[in-house]
Amino acid sequence: FIKSHKDAPFFLHLSHHAVHTALQAPASVVDKYKNKPVGKYHTNPVYAAMIEKLDDGVGKICRAIQEMGIEENTIIIFYSDNGGSEPVTDNYPLHGGKGTPYEGGSRVPLIIKWPGKIPAGTRTSVPVIGVDFYPTFVHLAKGETSGNPDGRDIFEVVKNKETERDLFWHFPAYLESYLNGGKDFRARPYSSIRSGDWKLIYNYEDKSMELYNLKEDLGETRNMAGLNPTKKGRTL
């Protein structure tokens, strides 16, 4: 696809199967991780092997773009749509996983490669969200967005260090009742808001709230909703 479109603008969306279940990878790569010392938290050699093969696949694309001489005019974005699924994997030090309102479900990898525009090794702690991709791509293509999109141009957000922009998640549904022998759901209806270092979660079933300071408590172990009513009220 890339070779046949290298002389004209193109958009490629490639969704790898890895690292979804069923967990499987070449035996030689699995053995490589089986022979490594056991880690403290992440101890699944098959999962590790799948990640390596995913990395190999991304590397092939990067090399092909470089060999065709279009590297400096091509933006590569590596992104995950959600956190790892429990109990298949452990998202430590984050709490929760895919479908949950916690950081283990929503804090995901995002890497952008754009030679000549983004210096290698650049890092930022400014939060962005998936709905930002649409306005970002439109602006990069020198187009105009229609209506009033929820997202913002990622490059402008990072450039201006808009740390105070609130981010919202709304999940009014029940997700997959396969936990505990089919007796429980992976996720129940919730909404959440990220405001600076703070995150507020509202659970629709019992109308309870959870408030966490992610800067001080990334693992979301201390619910501050009852201890910091002022911040809870401002976030609401």
Kindly label every feature range from the protein language model.
Residues 10-15, 47, 51, 58, ...:
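Beta-strand elements within well-structured catalytic alpha/beta cores of enzymes
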